[in-house]
Amino acid sequence: MPKNMSPICPVCGQENDAANRYCSFCGTRFNSSLPSMDLFQAQTVQAPAPEQMVFSGNGQDLPSLTNHPFWGAIPVLGLLTVLPLGLFIFGMAIDANDWPYAALLVFLLFLFTLLIFLGQLWGNVSQAREFILSERPLILWRYSPDEWQQLRQAQFSESAEDMQEMAGCAVPFFAGVGTLLGTVLGSVEGFVGAVPGAAIGAMAGYIFGKILVPIATGLNQSTNRELYRTDLPVWVVLAPGEIYYNRQYFRADTIGDRLEGITLDEGALTWLRIETFAPRGSITASFDGNILVPHRMLATVKAVLPQLQQFISGED
C-alpha cells in the first residue's frame, strides 16, 4: 500500500494513519505489509473521540521489574534472606555450637528461592517487552480510566465473595478435623476418653478456623489489591497462545504453561475468560485470566476469538 494512503480498518471501517500497525479505534491489527510502528515507543496518536484507542508513548507502558505486580515480594524475600544470615554471623561471633549452622542452611534456602524468583521475574518481563513490540499481537487496547475503575471494583467484589464462600466452609472443615483428631487421641483411653477428646478437638478446630480465616482473607485482599494497585489504566495485548494483561505475561508452550480454555462471557459486564495452567512454583501460576472487554472492543474480540483459541490444549 502506498505510504500516502490511509488504511481502512476491516472490522470497524474507520480510517487510520498510514503508519499505524493497529487500528486506533478498535485495536485490530492491520496487514503486516503496512509500514511498521513501535506502538509503545511512538508518539501519542490523539484520538478524536474518548472511546477510541490512544497509543501512548509513555515509557511507563512498557513492562519493567519495578511495575510488575510481584515486585513487592522482593523486599520480603530479601528480608527473610538477610535475617538468618545475621543470626549465623551473630552465632559465630559468640562461639555458639550448633544453631548458627542451621541458620546458615536457612539463609542458603531463602537465597536460592530469591534468586529463582528474580530469574523468573526478569524472564517474564523480558518476554513481555519482546512480545509487545513484535508483530505477533492480533489485538490490543487500553482501558479508559472509567473502565479500569469498573474492572478494579468488579475484581475486589468477586474476590470478597470467593473469600466469604471459603470462610463458610473453612470453619466447619477445621472443626471436623479437630473432632476426628480428638476422637483418635482420646480413644487411647477407651470410649470414656474419646467423647471428651472429640469435644475438645472440635472446639480447638473451630477456634483455629476462626483465627485462620481472617488471616487468609487479609492476605487474599492484600494480594488482589497489589495486582490492581496502579491507578493507571493498563494494556491488554492478545495473540494466539500469548497474553499480556495487567503487567503480567503468559505464553503457552510445550514445557509446562498451557491454555486450557478461552471463552467470552457476556452479561451485564462482558469478560474474556482465559483458563491457564502453570507448574507450581512458576511465576505464571497466579496469572489472572479474567479480562473485562469494553463494549467498544466487543466486536473486535469476537472476530479474533477463533484465532486466540488455536493454542488451547488438545485443539492445536
UniProtKB/Swiss-Prot annotation:
It is a multi-pass membrane protein. GO terms for cellular component: plasma membrane. It holds the Pfam family DUF6861. The keyword ATP-binding does not apply. The chain crosses the membrane at residues 74-94, 99-119, 166-186, 188-208. It is found in: Cell membrane. Its main location: membrane. Keywords: Cell membrane, Membrane, Transmembrane, Transmembrane helix. InterPro entries: Tre1-like_N. This is Uncharacterized protein slr0273. It comes from Synechocystis sp. (strain ATCC 27184 / PCC 6803 / Kazusa).
